[in-house]
């Protein structure tokens, strides 16, 4: 039997039905957090199939080149911690709980979705870890995806693109 989700109490209150794409909520929340996303550059990877593999390879290449690199992917298999890789490995349960525990009022005020909340936590964790570059895997769409809130994305990669989410994305 799987262990209980150590983040359910912090993330479940923000779960909503349906897709709610947009950047305004997360941009406002990041401003309140002091814009942690401005403290590192990013590569954003979008697409239907293969973006997780491409993101992981780019992270490995940057790390091998001596760059302090972070990786943000979704979804996770077993733990929310799998989504955030710092230079020293996956973020731990306690550090992620600390980041999330400091955000409920902010998340309620800006009506963040769980994906936006965990993206904000990733940006804070990357900034605190001194990451120079983060590889950000798009969750859904690209243009209105939470990862697009990052202002310094000199490289945007595309994996193969399908029509599987056309009803949300047009």
Task: Show which residues each predicted segment covers.
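A short, structure-level motif marking secondary-structure boundaries and short turns
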Residues: 12, 42-44, 107-108
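A conserved segment at the C-terminal end of the G1
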Residues: 41-45, 53-70
């Amino acid at each position: 039997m799987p262990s209980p989700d150590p983040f359910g109490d912090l993330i479940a209150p923000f779960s909503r039905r349906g897709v709610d794409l947009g950047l305004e909520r997360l941009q406002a929340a990041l401003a309140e957090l002091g814009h942690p996303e401005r403290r590192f550059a990013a590569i954003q990877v979008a697409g239907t199939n293969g973006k997780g593999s491409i993101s992981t390879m780019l992270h490995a290449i940057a790390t091998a080149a001596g760059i302090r690199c972070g990786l943000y992917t979704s979804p996770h298999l077993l733990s929310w911690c799998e989504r955030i890789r710092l230079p020293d490995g996956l973020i731990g349960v306690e550090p992620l709980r600390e980041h999330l525990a400091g955000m409920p009022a902010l998340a309620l005020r800006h009506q963040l979705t769980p994906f936006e909340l965990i993206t904000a936590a990733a940006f804070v964790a990357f900034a605190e870890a001194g990451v120079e570059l983060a590889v950000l895997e798009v969750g859904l769409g690209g243009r209105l995806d939470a990862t697009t809130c990052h202002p310094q994305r000199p490289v945007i990669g595309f994996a193969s693109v399908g029509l599987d989410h056309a009803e949300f994305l047009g």
